[in-house]
Amino acid sequence: MEESAIRKAAAQMMELHGNGAELAAASKADAMLNQGNIDGFYAWNRISAAINDLDRKAV
């Protein structure tokens, strides 16, 4: 997944989930791992990290 797609997904998650966006992304990463979807796991971990980064920049 390209960085621009990661950032877009992070912004969408923040819009949908507000302060719970990072937790929601982490939950999706866990679900991907439980399903054996390693690529999905890494993608959602990157989205979670991007949410954290955007949160820090917003402060």
What are these regions (language model features)?
Residues 1, 56-59:
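Short intrinsically disordered terminal tails
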Residues 1-20:
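N-terminal acidic leader/helix
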Residues 14-50, 54:
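Amphipathic, hydrophobic secondary-structure cores in small proteins
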